A protein has these predicted regions:
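Conserved GNAT acetyl-CoA-binding A-motif
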Residues: 104-116
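Alpha-helical macromolecular-interaction surfaces
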Residues: 95, 99, 122-123
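Terminal substrate-recognition subdomain of acyl/acetyltransferases
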Residues: 146-154
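Conserved acetyl-CoA-binding loop of GNAT-fold acetyltransferases
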Residues: 109, 128-137
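Conserved G/P- and acidic residue-centered "switch" motifs that form tight phosphate/ATP-binding loops
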Residues: 60, 91-93, 108
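Conserved beta-strand-loop-alpha-helix junction that forms the acyl-donor binding cleft
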Residues: 88, 114-124, 141-145
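Extreme N-terminal starter segment of soluble prokaryotic enzymes
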Residues: 1-3
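Acetyl-CoA-dependent GNAT
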Residues: 5-79, 84-85, 97-99, 103, ...
Length: 154
């Protein structure tokens, strides 16, 4: 699997499509996260030097994405970890997560946070725990019942 930082207009459009697929798969209205504004402004907060918007390419096909953004002086947030269905179950999600964690360390962040949901994201929660993420109190308001907040010390 290869990773590219989405930067060209074509790459940004591909990332936007993946984000839209992610939102449809999630089956939750992400308006509380200003998702429409996020899509319109890509790469936005995910742009270097403080952020990343990575897309995964597997067998010359766009497989998935992951992003990170700065949310505090030494803290970043992992966002939008997503794989298209035909690429799941092959360890690619772990590779995406490990790559974005390595990017966060390279930037100089000391901790990475994320929020996730039980149910549809149970496999992701298992992955996050395996990578060393620990549950923490909510660090922002997420109105979705059962939202889980996690942090990894980098």
């Amino acid at each position: 699997m290869n990773f590219i930082q989405a930067s060209s207009p074509e790459e940004i459009e591909s990332a936007r499509e993946l984000f839209e697929e992610y939102a449809a798969w999630l089956q939750i209205d992400l308006c509380f996260q200003s998702f429409d504004k996020e899509l319109a402004g890509l790469p936005g907060q995910y742009a270097p030097p403080d952020g990343r918007l990575l897309m995964a390419i597997e067998d010359d096909q766009l497989a998935g994405c992951v992003a990170l953004r700065k949310i505090g002086e030494d803290t970043c947030e992992m966002k939008r970890l997503f794989l298209r269905s035909q690429f799941r179950g092959k360890g690619l999600g772990r590779k995406l997560a490990e790559t974005i964690i390595a990017e966060a360390r390279q930037i100089g962040y000391e901790r990475m946070r994320l929020d996730t949901l039980p149910g549809r994201m149970d496999q992701a929660i298992k992955l996050y725990r395996a990578l060393g993420f620990q549950e923490i109190p909510a660090y922002y308001h997420n109105p979705v019942e059962g939202a889980t907040f996690m942090e990894l010390l980098l």
